[in-house]
Amino acid sequence: MFDITLVHAREILDSRGNPTVEAEVTLSGGAVGRAAVPSGASTGEHEAVELRDGDNARYLGKGVLKAVENVEGEIAQALGGMDASQQRDIDMRMLDLDGTENKGRLGANAILAVSMASARAVANQLDIPLYRYLGGVNGNILPVPMMNILNGGAHADNNVDFQEFMAMPVGAESFSEALRWGAEVFHTLKGVLKKRGYNTAVGDEGGFAPSLKSNVEAIEVILEAIQQAGYTPGEQIAIALDPAASEFFKDGKYIFKKSDKSEKTSEQMVRWWSDWANKYPIVSIEDGLAEDDWEGWKLLTDELGDKIQLVGDDLFVTNPERLARGIDNGVANSILIKVNQIGTLSETLDAIEMARRNGYTAVISHRSGETEDTFIADLAVATGAGQIKTGSASRTDRVAKYNQLLRIEEQLGAGARFLGIGALNYDGDLSAE
């Protein structure tokens, strides 16, 4: 019933109009699973390799026909007849076939598409939701959304150095209420920006991308929007940041090249984040320092690790080996989970499990180049991660994930759980913000 009879792939477009891989896996029982892979704009140096064609005559070199060919050729041949319900066997077969550390031969985009499609095919064959297949009876925790309502850095053409400013409705009682609060703040923010004379065009992830006067003003307009929407900053809706510091780190210095051109050392950046955490209702900072600035990360964790959530994205790249180094060195207290950073579902689940065993939280995340695929919504519930980062309340590629979570919440009914601030590694006093 679960034997793989056909593996097919095609080149489709992501939310930025760039090609990506979509795979379909057909089982002997008749079920078909389909999955599409996302891609990132600010990619970590240590991520698994996305295979691109490099043919400038097609899609400016970004085509993925080689990856598609690898799926329909080597991968399809290797997986034919295998039991798709044995996810780890499927993934290990593809890893062995690729034979590289970074999945660069077959392409992480080829491998991941098949890995996710296989899981979805089995869920479809069993006629159960994907989150239930992946998570069993424990799959009942709806995540707190990190809603990226203001964009800068590599995600926007403006003068804000930091990549993402997010609203987190940590005081809500349910996912649907949290989503409503976040959407209301997003729409209110549009009015705040318009009143100040700013453009309200949106960036890759659906957040606004105005040319603000400073990084501080980004925080200020969000706080104003939270209050205007009728909510209490900190107690009901807190702020999460993703500076993506690797993007402005060069030659051992952090260069604020988009704003005031100032340069900062690791120690000065730690002081910067400490000052902001004390001044504003910030509950989470992701990639506050560069991916290979391990000494700086240690300083940051010593300073803020027992107070707020410190998330490693480029630092860990969803890789259990890099996460193990962070755990051993007491660096960060949370990991961002992006399935295409590591390249298989099994390795993704391994990273989440390792984080959980060592007291780290896990935040399930999209990429800036997304598709309509809602796999990560089910993954968030299946793993009980408690947090999801999947953009703003605009752009269908982002909202698709939120809508899937609304459906899951409805399916779970009274069994649905929502942890709010309890989902984070946060030890501050929200009411005092």
Curated annotation (Swiss-Prot):
It comes from the Bacteria. Pfam families: Enolase_C, Enolase_N. It catalyses: (2R)-2-phosphoglycerate = phosphoenolpyruvate + H2O. (2R)-2-phosphoglycerate binds at residues 163, 338, 367-368, 389. The keyword Metal-binding applies. Mg(2+) binds at residues 242, 286, 313. Binds a second Mg(2+) ion via substrate during catalysis. Belongs to the enolase family. HAMAP family: Enolase. Catalyzes the reversible conversion of 2-phosphoglycerate (2-PG) into phosphoenolpyruvate (PEP). It is essential for the degradation of carbohydrates via glycolysis. This is Enolase. It comes from Koribacter versatilis (strain Ellin345).
